């Protein structure tokens, strides 16, 4: 099969796939060598970017996926009436602990958060952002939790190594809080001195 036809087949496979597709899966489905498919994926990615299309080809969670451009998110949201997945502060805390400490038990999560996390962990399991990765080899054999492929997809990561370090995360958090405080003060919100008065 010629290159033009193979590229069209790869594009069709990516379009029809419900999630990321590994290079090996694409090659198998297209009946082609992975070494021939990989450069065509790079070509498609470049073509979509240059053409200014409404979608891009991204590599994440060890696979390739066609996704809408981030700048078109508002219009895509209008199309879908269902609410996007939102995470509570408690869920984000538990998810951060799991992401950075995995594999981790629920008791470890409870200890680090200082409160019972059973409901939060169940919610994260239901959303498929975390998964059970095994059992700890201690009396009682508690379940061990880790992040899932859906976690990587949700946050647009290729792998866990793309997570910011704890130091970077702390700096980003401080910067975000500072910007939020400046915005509130500039918008006529309460300032630190007026709250203390």
UniProtKB/Swiss-Prot annotation:
Gene3D superfamilies: Winged helix-like DNA-binding domain superfamily/Winged helix DNA-binding domain. InterPro entries: ScpB_csome_segregation, WH-like_DNA-bd_sf, WH_DNA-bd_sf. Keywords: Cell cycle, Cell division, Chromosome partition, Cytoplasm. It holds the Pfam family SMC_ScpB. The keyword Cell cycle applies. One of its GO terms (cellular component) is cytoplasm. Participates in chromosomal partition during cell division. May act via the formation of a condensin-like complex containing Smc and ScpA that pull DNA away from mid-cell into both cell halves. Homodimer. Homodimerization may be required to stabilize the binding of ScpA to the Smc head domains. Component of a cohesin-like complex composed of ScpA, ScpB and the Smc homodimer, in which ScpA and ScpB bind to the head domain of Smc. The presence of the three proteins is required for the association of the complex with DNA. This is Segregation and condensation protein B. It comes from Syntrophotalea carbinolica (strain DSM 2380 / NBRC 103641 / GraBd1) (Pelobacter carbinolicus).
